[in-house]
């Protein structure tokens, strides 16, 4: 139960997120700040394989496949690089690859483009939508950026003052005009 009422269900059952992120086909999350989300002393291989090792779901080759799916060449010289030596865009892709190794049914992406330049943002949005189409997972894309939301989303919802409202396409112009998605 949620404060004020309501509940969260996943695949028809009460959601236990402590368990769901530890199993294949569960829920994975990509955070806004990949620098804080990834251990800077780990290598790329260690960071991407960590969720599988912690959950006991290790699969040979899963890290390499996930890295290639996000556009990172999984050669030995890249796999042995430390997280702190990567660019912001590379770190965000490693964070996404890390989530993909667990073959999520639901990927929660919390402001994944906020720390990227416009080109990096556009590339990441295209990549995420392509991954969603190819791998078949659902995605909850959390953002203040209406343009990004319009590019990647099949359905839009607005959370305002604790109320969740589904927007229909006719609402998008009004939302943009009202500035409801401005972070300021």
Task: Briefly describe each language-model feature range.
Residues 82-86, 90:
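Conserved ABC ATPase signature
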Residues 103:
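Conserved catalytic motifs of ABC-family nucleotide-binding domains
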Residues 107-110:
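Catalytic Walker B motif of ABC-type/P-loop ATPase nucleotide-binding domains
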Residues 60-77:
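Conserved ABC ATPase "signature" region
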Residues 33, 42-54:
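Q-loop/switch helix immediately C-terminal to the Walker
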Residues 159, 163-183:
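Conserved beta-strand-loop-alpha-helix hinge in the C-terminal portion
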Residues 2-3, 13-28, 42, 54:
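ABC ATPase NBD coupling module
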């Amino acid at each position: 139960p949620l404060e004020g009422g309501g509940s969260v269900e996943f695949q028809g059952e009460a959601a236990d997120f402590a368990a769901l992120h530890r199993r294949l086909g569960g829920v994975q999350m990509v955070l806004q700040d990949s620098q804080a989300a990834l251990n800077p002393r780990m290598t790329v291989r260690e960071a991407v394989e960590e969720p599988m090792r912690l959950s006991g779901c290790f699969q040979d080759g899963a890290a390499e496949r996930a890295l290639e799916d996000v556009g990172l060449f999984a050669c030995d010289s890249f796999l042995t690089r430390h997280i702190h030596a990567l660019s912001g865009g590379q770190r965000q892709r490693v964070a996404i690859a890390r989530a993909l190794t667990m073959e999520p049914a639901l990927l929660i992406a919390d402001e994944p483009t906020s720390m990227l330049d416009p080109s990096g943002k556009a590339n990441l949005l295209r990549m995420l939508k392509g991954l969603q189409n190819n791998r078949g997972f659902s995605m909850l894309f959390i953002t203040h950026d209406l343009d990004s939301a319009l590019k990647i989303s099949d359905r839009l919802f607005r959370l305002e003052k604790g109320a969740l409202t589904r927007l229909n396409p006719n609402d998008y112009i009004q939302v943009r005009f009202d500035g409801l998605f401005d972070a300021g």
